Amino acid sequence: MASEQLMSPASGGGRYFQMQPEQFPSMVSSLFSFAPAPTQETNRIFEELPKAVIVSVSRPDAGDISPVLLSYTIECQYKQFKWQLVKKASQVFYLHFALKKRAFIEEIHEKQEQVKEWLQNLGIGDHPPVVQDEDADEVPLHQDESAKNRDVPSSAALPVIRPLGRQQSISVRGKHAMQEYLNHFLGNLDIVNSREVCRFLEVSMLSFSPEYGPKLKEDYIMVKHLPKFSKSDDDSNRCCGCCWFCCCNDNWQKVWGVLKPGFLALLEDPFDAKLLDIIVFDVLPVSNGNDGVDISLAVELKDHNPLRHAFKVTSGNRSIRIRAKNSAKVKDWVASINDAALRPPEGWCHPHRFGSYAPPRGLTDDGSQAQWFVDGGAAFAAIAAAIENAKSEIFICGWWVCPELYLRRPFDPHTSSRLDNLLENKAKQGVQIYILIYKEVALALKINSVYSKRRLLGIHENVRVLRYPDHFSSGVYLWSHHEKLVIVDNQVCFIGGLDLCFGRYDTFEHKVGDNPSVTWPGKDYYNPRESEPNTWEDALKDELERKKHPRMPWHDVHCALWGPPCRDVARHFVQRWNYAKRNKAPYEDSIPLLMPQHHMVIPHYMGRQEESDIESKKEEDSIRGIRRDDSFSSRSSLQDIPLLLPHEPVDQDGSSGGHKENGTNNRNGPFSFRKSKIEPVDGDTPMRGFVDDRNGLDLPVAKRGSNAIDSEWWETQDHDYQVGSPDETGQVGPRTSCRCQIIRSVSQWSAGTSQVEESIHSAYRSLIDKAEHFIYIENQFFISGLSGDDTVKNRVLEALYKRILRAHNEKKIFRVVVVIPLLPGFQGGIDDSGAASVRAIMHWQYRTIYRGHNSILTNLYNTIGVKAHDYISFYGLRAYGKLSEDGPVATSQVYVHSKIMIVDDRAALIGSANINDRSLLGSRDSEIGVLIEDTELVDSRMAGKPWKAGKFSSSLRLSLWSEHLGLRTGEIDQIIDPVSDSTYKEIWMATAKTNTMIYQDVFSCVPNDLIHSRMAFRQSLSYWKEKLGHTTIDLGIAPEKLESYHNGDIKRSDPMDRLKAIKGHLVSFPLDFMCKEDLRPVFNESEYYASPQVFH
């Protein structure tokens, strides 16, 4: 039905005409065509009222356009954050104008809604009329009484704008007036959270997130490198004066800059926590290389246009041009950024000890703690428990990641602990998961990372995966990303030699068999010496015939870190993730940029109770959409990693797969920790620190109070595992307070840094040089060079050589013990045509150890004679067992994959870096590690004298040695002193020699010192194949009966009877194996045409 409207034509007399209903809405909207009111910010920055105090008032410069206006220094405080603002009275005027404008528009908007409702009640509008209940109260004109409270009277602002009075009293009156005005809007939470006040106070959604550090500078700036994004139509927030003169082209966009101690973040809006871009501060070059002038992170730029004011921020391989409103703001930004980048203790743009990006931690009571894990079983169980306790985010970085990996064994009852199931469960709970994996060259490696990425991405939308590098675009074909990291909530991280992939799970028993399958399902029953699977997609399908081939046991060491070192590791991950994202997915919104977290020290005016209160609000903050884990607290939300030990040290289902009847069967599990009095390091402890003297780090370490958390342990995680203490297991160490420093190998290609970092290499050399008595090394490779070696560049070998010569000249006992794999862990027999890579690596290792003028033993023999073995010796590991109940007895090397060095039982270096040029030079493979220096000492002995050993380092060595030597419970005291003859010669060397001889008698396995050429190897292989019918690629199958001659008679015996005399897994490294062969690739092998750098 049409509506009618009265019209008054010029001819006089009224007449009516009909108007269609659809015309009314447009008419109504045209009557109230005011600018829409800004919506009330749903994300509130302030949860409680901040405080602000005027600390000083300054008179304007003589050249000021308005000399009567004053500048005010305002000190603000919100919770544990303090910051200062310098505001002119004119800025107060603009703030007041903006608040009045907001109030006016809100009022108009409210009345517009009321008129619309009134018209609808008359049946004129689009919607049916609102029928009001007769009993309902009359709707007041102003339904929101808080709107009146949000208004700031103009009378409050006027004294601030122009304080009246005599010249002498203007400053006093102005200070009083400004304080009164601040009190008006600081007393109302709605006004404080308005966009106008938040901009005036220079705050945003990131300002008060404690995990990102203290509040520094924030403001609107202009950038042009970002793609176009949606912008507000409100021009009142324009930051650049030149905008009014149209000097900025369309490529420049206004963003909100947030400066934190470790980065500069760019946001679209203060109320939006989503990153548009981030500049993570990194070590700057010392000079520009031309005139020796130091390079700054931020520098002011000169522009021929006087209306443009800009500066440049350079970090890593990135350089961003930024504009500000005026020259004063540019100078303020430049000074603030450079100050933040060099602010102690981090000083991210200043290289620290060893040239590392990260500073030494634990010099004070900052919560730095570490815990070691020996072999994959212990480490994987701890990682699983940490993932299960994740609350906000998980970072995973690996050379190889297998989604189907079981982190707890036996695998059948632990399906929930499979990696993909663990991650899926946490992703469904809202935990954000970021996985960074190495993109291999498919022709060289068979790890199939594209399959891993596809499987991981299919878990849940909260799982993000990046593979890097893209080889063609980056030009990187020879080098890899080799780090192995798991970081949970920035609270605990795991670092070391273990990838989350097949073949790595193992225990101290190092079983060679598993038939029927109980512990190692499908392709996890892994022996790369025998065969590398062509595909990993059918993970539960066996690659090896279990009745014929042993698995290759895997020995590794991993470490958990808490406190500032954990966040330093996370910072490395963030740096690598952001660099990969910019190169591979710059415009993909589903792959976000990440922000590094910061160790924030509680200010002096706040106590431990305040810290606890902040921590209790973590859950509330996560609901608001910003992860505010209390990472500045020295108390982690995660408790100690559980000490996990299988209930049964023998076969878990009664099968005999991998059964050992040897000395290690009598161990009753790993050794028990020796109970010793623990003493913190104080200023009087005669401990030569493993630090550079110029850094002044030999400072007393603050003693930890009674609230130390060494005794806190997680509850049982699963019925098949029990929680123990450090006195009950030898595969998990005590959680220990210590000094820590994160070290790494990175360069431009791997992390986008402006210069090469080789701090792992520097740390190795420094530790060796400062060692007093003893160095213990376990590593996958041992390839290094002496001074003058132009081919192998790293100088770990040179440092060892010099230290040994010094000990010899000083006539002091000094021991270096090196444990490495017996053979490279690559496919192919020693004589196979396709095993040139195996032989090439053997060449470089023997070149380092014993062959040629560049080897350490050759040089030591030439200098000190046969006593060289008193100073340095080399070893490997080997295991044996039955492949099945009625199967043959087999042996395999225990593949040493750990990357550790322990010095004087007081310092330990653990990480992913091998001892070769690939890992140590920084410009090749990317690596990460941690140097741990003990601050908690225990009574021990060294060279026959009392010695204060470190709790972390000594317990790790004792665990490793008790496993390698097969020591029973109660025998640990025999190896307390690692350098005495009774330990080094009578136990360590004697055990290795005896075990090696027994393995030779039973198996004649390779490598050994009796086979000097490929021809001799062919003859031995042919003999054993003819005698046994089948053997392994390294002659690892024993005959059913051993034959020996006694008084002319042949005596036959069970090989297991002979093998019972073996203790542990330690064997001598065969120095004479293949000594008559040149093991380098030859012209008809493809490896001949590859760069030798690939192998060393």
Curated annotation (Swiss-Prot):
Record-given protein name: Phospholipase D zeta 1
Keywords, ordered alphabetically: Acetylation, Cytoplasmic vesicle, Hydrolase, Lipid degradation, Lipid metabolism, Repeat
Sequence ranges of Basic and acidic residues compositional bias: 139-151, 607-632
pH-dependent activity: Optimum pH is 7.0.
Top class in the EC scheme: hydrolase
Sites bearing N-acetylalanine, chain numbering: 2
Gene: PLDZETA1
Region (Disordered): 131-152, 607-691
